[in-house]
A protein has these predicted regions:
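Histidine-rich, glycine-flanked metal-binding segment
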Residues: 22-24, 31, 35-78
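Positively charged n-region of N-terminal signal peptides that target proteins for export
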Residues: 1-4
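Active-site mouth loops of central-metabolism enzymes
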Residues: 97-110, 169-184
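Active-site core of metal-dependent hydrolases
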Residues: 202-334, 353, 360, 396-399, ...
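Metal-associated gating/positioning segment near the N- to mid-region
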Residues: 76-143, 210, 231-251
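His/Asp/Glu-enriched, well-ordered alpha-helical/loop segment
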Residues: 319-330, 335-423
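Bacterial N-terminal signal peptides
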Residues: 6-16
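Divalent metal-dependent hydrolysis catalytic cores, especially in the metallo-beta-lactamase
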Residues: 112-135, 152-159, 193-205, 225, ...
Length: 444
């Protein structure tokens, strides 16, 4: 009843206060609002400029005369997807040495804009980049967020915080800040905050518990969350003891053959409200392409990338035998253990996000999110609705953007996708994003 009344009040307010010429209605269609409740059949969403002003049923909402109508009948209307783990500087090529050796000077001209476009076209309207060259990624964020390059709302970590630099980039490509000590860690987190980073990324199990504790504590003091790339159970325990906290994320959770985490690890994850980021597609993508090379001919891959880069990425799978690649082995060797551990965490009540690591090997931006959602459902036992909520509302919480995005509600930004299908029956329908609206602007 309250919901009905509030919709009505908003609708009446709309008619009197707003100029109908500026209002757009998404009319018909089933609305999944991101909160996890029953969908609204024959839904209507009114947008005024960049904001949503009403969400409800056709019977509840008056559409002012002169309103522009977008017909969404037969389709699913839901919040734009949020991916909390992407990399704008890679496009799914199988060989990082080759990629960075050849293309570091094409990041701004071609690669990052192509990644941004591919994400947005796939219905991903907000992302968190978890590690790239500092100068390029701050530039990219400002270009996209000021509207100069089409792409999702972009939040960034800047560099990986590690004990050693990454091996495959040149000296001039500053994607790593090496941590020397706990004091150094604090200083670097403060420096990143000053520079305007949105999140801190640790990517090294060699960081000591003291160094991690300094990173977590300083980041939390600065109002930043931390995403930690961790595989081994012992390293997860170290990060938990070091104070990884509420809605910080453990990226790549579930890795390795072991079929359960020790009870103390699960308990700390629950007590500290750490969010689980499984990035399953970053493990399974190579298997999918090796077993079905036709995937590299997907027209969406061709559509989103400059022709020569697409050709080079395709060649890296079509003309190289990758069956002895460690990722291919891991895809099958770790699957049973990962599934068992993810289900253990799910049953215990851990918070789950949807996190793709898109751009990594065989994990192109146009496919990452819908594939990860399907794998999440299969491997964790989450319901389709739970996965949809994780990909929208929960991910907005992780990014500290829950007041602006993540659910379809009056007052929030109009980041909305229209899916040609029914993801509550078949999550793979998320592949068929027909329209993408970001901030009230229709991008496709
Ligand atoms: Zn990553």
């Amino acid at each position: 009843m309250f919901r009905y009344l509030s919709c009505l009040i908003i609708a009446l307010f709309t008619i009197s206060a707003a100029n109908a010429v500026d209002i757009t209605a998404l009319k018909g269609g089933r609305i999944i609002d991101g909160n996890g409740g029953a969908p609204i059949v024959d839904g209507v969403i009114l947008m005024d400029g960049e904001r949503i002003i009403a969400v409800g049923n056709e019977d509840d909402i008056n559409i002012p005369t002169g309103t522009k109508i977008i017909d969404t009948n037969g389709m699913t209307v839901m919040p734009g997807l949020i991916d909390i783990h992407v990399h704008f500087d890679i496009l799914g090529h199988s060989d990082y040495n080759h990629w960075f050796g050849k293309y570091e000077n094409r990041m701004r001209s071609d690669i990052m804009p192509a990644a941004a476009k591919a994400m947005l076209m796939a219905g991903v309207t907000s992302v968190r980049d978890l590690g790239a060259d500092v100068s390029n990624i701050f530039w990219l964020r400002d270009q996209v967020n000021s509207g100069k390059i089409p792409g999702p709302r972009t939040f960034i970590a800047g560099p990986f915080l590690r004990k050693t630099a990454t091996a495959f980039v040149s000296d001039g490509y500053k994607d790593t800040w090496v941590i020397e000590s706990p004091e150094d860690a604090r200083e670097k987190v403060r420096k990143l905050k000053e520079m305007g980073a949105d999140v801190i990324k640790t990517q090294d199990e060699a960081l000591s518990q003291e160094e991690l504790a300094a990173i977590y504590d300083e980041a939390h003091k600065q109002g930043l969350r931390v995403a930690s790339h961790i595989y081994a159970a012992e390293a997860i325990r170290t990060a938990l003891k070091a104070g990884i906290g509420e809605y910080d994320t453990i990226e790549h959770i579930g890795e390795y053959e072991a079929t359960a985490y020790d009870d103390d690890i699960v308990q700390m994850i629950l007590d500290q409200k750490v969010a689980m980021a499984a990035t399953i597609i970053a493990r399974d993508g190579l298997r999918q392409i090796i077993e079905n090379p036709e995937l590299t001919d997907d027209p969406r891959w061709i559509r989103d990338l400059p022709a020569d880069l697409y050709a080079d990425v395709r060649k890296s799978y079509r003309e190289v035998d990758l069956t002895d690649h460690p990722l291919y082995d891991k895809a099958s060797a770790h699957r049973a253990g990962r599934m068992a551990k993810l289900r253990q965490l799910k049953e215990a009540g851990a918070i789950f996000t949807v996190s793709t690591d898109s751009g990594t090997r065989a994990n192109p931006h146009h496919d990452a999110m819908w594939k990860e959602m399907v794998l999440m459902q299969e491997e964790t036992g989450m319901t389709n609705m739970e996965v949809l909520v994780a990909a929208t509302k929960t991910n907005a919480l992780v990014m500290q953007q829950q007041d602006k995005i993540g659910t379809l509600e009056a007052g929030k930004l109009a980041d909305i996708i229209i899916v040609d299908g029914d993801p509550l029956s078949h999550l793979s329908d998320m592949r068929r994003v027909k329209h993408v609206i970001k901030g009230g602007v229709l991008f496709r």
